[in-house]
Amino acid sequence: MIEPQKSTDVTQALLQTYPDLKVICAPTTVGIAAAAKVLQDNGSSCKLTGLGLPSEMSEYIGDDDAHSCPYMFLWNPEDVGRLGAYTSIALVNEEITGAAGDKFTAGDLGEYEVTEASDGGTEVILGSPFKFDPFNIDEWKDVY
C-alpha cells in the first residue's frame, strides 16, 4: 500500500535537501497529490508532474506560478476497463492464448498484441496515457 504520509515526507525532504529543485515527477496518484499539497502549502516554485487523478489534482493544475502542476497523466479508466473486457473475451473465445505475439481486435480501441512483461509473464498495453492540463481538467474532475 502506498501511504500519503511517506510521499509528504519525501517531498519535504527533497525541498529541504535541494532548495533549487525545479521539478518532481511522481509515479503514483497518491504521491502526486501529496507532493502537490506540500508544494502549494510551502509556496514552492518547484513544478510537479506524473500520474494523478483529476478529482484529487484539479486544484493544483494550472499554467501559472500559483499552481504546482502544469499537467499530469493517467490512463482513461473506461478504456482500461474496455480493453480488459475485450482481452478476457478474446481469451474465453480462444482467439488468443495469452502468449506473446497473439493479436486481437478490441472493438473501436483497435488492434492489440500480447507482449512479454518484465516479470516473465505477458501483458496487453493500452497505450499512451491521457494528458490533463488547465484546459481540460474541469471536464474530468467529477469523473474520477
For each predicted feature, which ranges?
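Active-site nucleophile and cofactor-binding loops and adjacent substrate-binding regions
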Residues: 25-28, 73-78
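Generic structural signal for alpha-helix termini and adjacent loop/cap motifs
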Residues: 17, 64, 91-95
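Rossmann-fold dehydrogenase core element
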Residues: 64-74
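Structural signal for conserved beta-strand scaffold positions within catalytic alpha/beta enzyme cores
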Residues: 50, 73-74, 133
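Short, well-ordered alpha-helices that flank and scaffold nucleotide-derived cofactor binding pockets
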Residues: 37, 41, 63, 86, ...
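Hydrophobic alpha-helical
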Residues: 1-60
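Hinge/cleft segment of the Venus flytrap/periplasmic-binding protein
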Residues: 87-144
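Hydrophobic alpha-helical segments within soluble ligand-binding/sensing domains
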Residues: 6-8, 53-59, 75-104
